[in-house]
């Protein structure tokens, strides 16, 4: 009898641990802030991954070219006044990457022909940022559908991997501490 209780406790302990940890994780018993501070992931993943190759009109005309091993830091400009902060932080993050500066490409997308002049004027302040016209505006709709914030209002920085998949975006913040956390994320990704 004593051996059966001992055997049952040995066999049931791992099952009990797995069930308890699963419940703990799924019901979110711990504070979300505590979890976010102890992780390297400070961005928000898109609801589903989507590839930028789907936006190509044909094989000769592509929306964006992906170079080997280069990640893309991008912003979709719908309002130039809102995008200034994201462009500024994109440049600062790129410079802060130090030796990995050449592994990241900065891109700005826009689709509204009415703001084209304002966007060109704005990008003169941010050299080495490629400007891409999303002529039919499909990209902003896909970004909006796959994010938890209003991409038209916020104009956040988002990350595209070297294979053309949109991975995550960073919610806009004026807090320098948040951008230090974003820099840590980028260093892990790159």
Walk through the language-model features, giving the residues of each.
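Thiol-/selenol-based redox modules, centered on thioredoxin-like
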Residues: 155, 159-190
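Short, internal strand/loop/helix patches
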Residues: 118-154
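N-terminal targeting signals for export/organelle localization
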Residues: 1-53
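A glycine-rich, hydrophobic loop/mini-helix early in the fold
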Residues: 47-67
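Sec/Tat-exported extracytoplasmic proteins
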Residues: 94-101, 143, 186, 190
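Structural microenvironment flanking redox-active thiols in thiol-disulfide oxidoreductases
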Residues: 81, 85-125
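Short active-site neighborhood of thiol/selenol oxidoreductases, capturing the structured segment around
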Residues: 62-90
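Structural beta-sheet core signal
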Residues: 73-75, 106-109, 159
């Amino acid at each position: 009898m004593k051996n059966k209780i001992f055997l049952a406790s040995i066999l049931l302990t791992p099952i009990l641990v797995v069930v308890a940890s699963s419940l703990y994780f799924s019901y979110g018993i711990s504070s979300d802030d505590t979890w976010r501070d102890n992780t390297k992931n400070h961005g928000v993943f898109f609801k589903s991954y989507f590839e930028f190759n789907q936006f190509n009109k044909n094989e000769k005309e592509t929306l964006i070219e992906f170079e080997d091993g280069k990640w893309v830091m991008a912003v979709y400009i719908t309002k130039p006044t809102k995008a200034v902060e994201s462009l500024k932080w994109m440049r600062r993050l790129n410079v802060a990457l130090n030796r990995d500066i050449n592994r990241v490409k900065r891109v700005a997308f826009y689709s509204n022909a009415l703001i084209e002049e304002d966007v060109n004027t704005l990008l003169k302040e941010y050299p080495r940022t490629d400007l891409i016209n999303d002529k039919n505006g499909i990209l902003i709709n896909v970004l909006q559908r796959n994010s938890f914030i209003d991409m038209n209002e916020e104009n956040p920085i988002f990350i595209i991997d070297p294979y053309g998949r949109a991975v995550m975006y960073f919610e806009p913040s004026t807090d320098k501490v948040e951008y230090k956390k974003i820099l840590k994320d980028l260093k892990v990704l790159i």
